Amino acid sequence: MTTQDIPSGTTVMYIPAEVCLSSSAVSQELNANSPTGGVAAAVDKLNKIGGQNSVADFYLFLKLLAEYEAEENSAYFGWLDGMPRLFYNAASMTDFCYECLPPLVFSLSRLEKVKFDNFKQVLSKVDIISDYTKNNDEVLKWAFNAVYTRAYADKDGQGSDVTITPLGDMFNHGTFPQVEVYFDEG
């Protein structure tokens, strides 16, 4: 942590592009590792139940679950181990919590909860995640919340491709950004 301002444009951290988790690259990897086509079947079902705007996030959700299962063998283990485990957003709320929300916040929270429920519903088709993990609600909430709070849309902001930048996701969680993020398209 610094106690003095640094000049604009100063590099604070460099994260190689190949370490970043982009939904387009992750989708290719997961589909290639899916022996019975379960990942593609889950995405197809997600599209059919109205989750077509969530497909990119779903791929990152699956990637985090796969890396979670790899434990210490995951190249992302240190980063995953340093992530928060407790979240206070819609996927983690109880029904009573929803009743206490003002109408607009309630409707926005329900959208997030429906997205999580859709992910859980189609997860049964995925063949690269163990049944133990598929039935572990706490792990599923953790992976969903990690994606939901850390993924950002492509430069056009259309969300067709979303990315999580390991370690780089630790910046800009306050009201005012601490750093300006720059991509060199490595």
What role is predicted for each listed range?
Residues M1-V19, S24-Q28, A66-G186:
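Long, positively charged leader/targeting segments at protein N-termini
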Residues N31-K63:
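Short peripheral tails and domain-boundary helices/loops at the edges of structured domains
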